[in-house]
Amino acid sequence: MKKLAAVMLTSCLMVAVGASFADEMKKDDMKKDVMMKKDDMAKDEMKKDSMAKDGMKKDAMKKDAMMKKDGMTKDEMKK
């Protein structure tokens, strides 16, 4: 009878330890998911910032092209 009680006790403890370990792993996975989401959000913000810079580049290119055209018309007027 003592052996049966000892086996039951050890098996219950093994199940409890396994469940505890599984919970810890689940919490760890949740932490990793949260960190990955934060990292993705940071990357999205970087993309938005680079898109704004692209807009500035395009605007500068337009101004540069307009100034070149203006310079050409002034040269034509001189002739």
Curated annotation (Swiss-Prot):
Region (Disordered): 37-79
Transmembrane segments: none
Signal peptide: 1-22
PTMs per UniProt: Protein is oxidized (possibly on Met residues) when cells are exposed to chlorite or hypochlorite; initially the protein is highly oxidized, by 50 minutes all protein is in the reduced form.
Gene ablation phenotype (knockout): Growth somewhat inhibited by chlorite.
Keyword Signal: yes
Gene Ontology cellular component list: periplasmic space
Keyword Signal belongs to the record: yes
Induction remarks: Part of the SigF regulon, induced by chlorite under positive control of SigF. Part of the probable yedZ1-yedY1-mrpX operon. Transcript levels are 20- to 60-fold increased when induced by chlorite or hypochlorite or in the absence of anti-sigma factor NrsF. Not induced by hydrogen peroxide.
Keyword entries, A-Z: Oxidation, Periplasm, Signal, Stress response
Cell compartments where the protein resides: Periplasm
InterPro entries: Penta_MxKDx
Known role: Serves as an oxidative stress sink, specifically for chlorite and hypochlorite.
Protein name: Methionine-rich peptide X
Gene behind this protein: mrpX
